[in-house]
């Protein structure tokens, strides 16, 4: 949980499969008095079925989703994001109304935080404790927790 004095919850979680995303959303739904917003993606060069599972869990369990990049490896990051979005549409969600697709994970986190209002909960899922993002063969420093804190600070919230 990230607390920088904002009037909504922010949770960073490692959930990166459909089942894990479903479970974290189910648990948070019980305590959420507003909207449940999720930032989530799917890793490249992994079982493509995970993309469907993540999209379906987000479509069914969250009120709003921002689909984004998560360890794309050698795959085109935006292609992965669009595929997740297409699965969400197949589950009845509307692009632009129920979900957004943003390749840049920082921008996706920022957008989710900007969308949040009092009593909402923003879940940043998929990376959790991990300290890097994988592009091709390169591991670049990355920390969802720190990015969420940085973006909350830019929105005027300080711990």
What kind of feature is each model-predicted range?
Residues 1-159:
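ATP-dependent carboxylate-amine ligase
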């Amino acid at each position: 949980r990230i607390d920088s004095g904002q009037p909504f919850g922010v949770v960073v979680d490692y959930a990166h499969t459909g089942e894990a995303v479903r479970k974290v959303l189910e648990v948070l739904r019980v305590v959420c008095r507003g909207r449940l917003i999720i930032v989530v993606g799917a890793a490249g060069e992994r079982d493509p079925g995970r993309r469907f599972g993540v999209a379906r869990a987000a479509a069914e369990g969250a009120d709003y989703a921002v689909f984004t990049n998560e360890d794309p490896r050698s795959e085109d990051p935006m292609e992965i994001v669009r595929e997740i979005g297409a699965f969400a549409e197949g589950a009845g969600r509307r692009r632009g109304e129920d979900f957004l697709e943003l390749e840049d994970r920082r921008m996706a986190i920022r957008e989710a935080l900007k969308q949040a209002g009092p009593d909402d909960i923003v879940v940043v899922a998929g990376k959790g404790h991990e300290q890097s993002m994988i592009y091709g063969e390169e591991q670049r420093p990355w920390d969802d927790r720190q990015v969420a804190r940085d973006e909350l600070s830019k929105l005027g919230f300080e711990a």
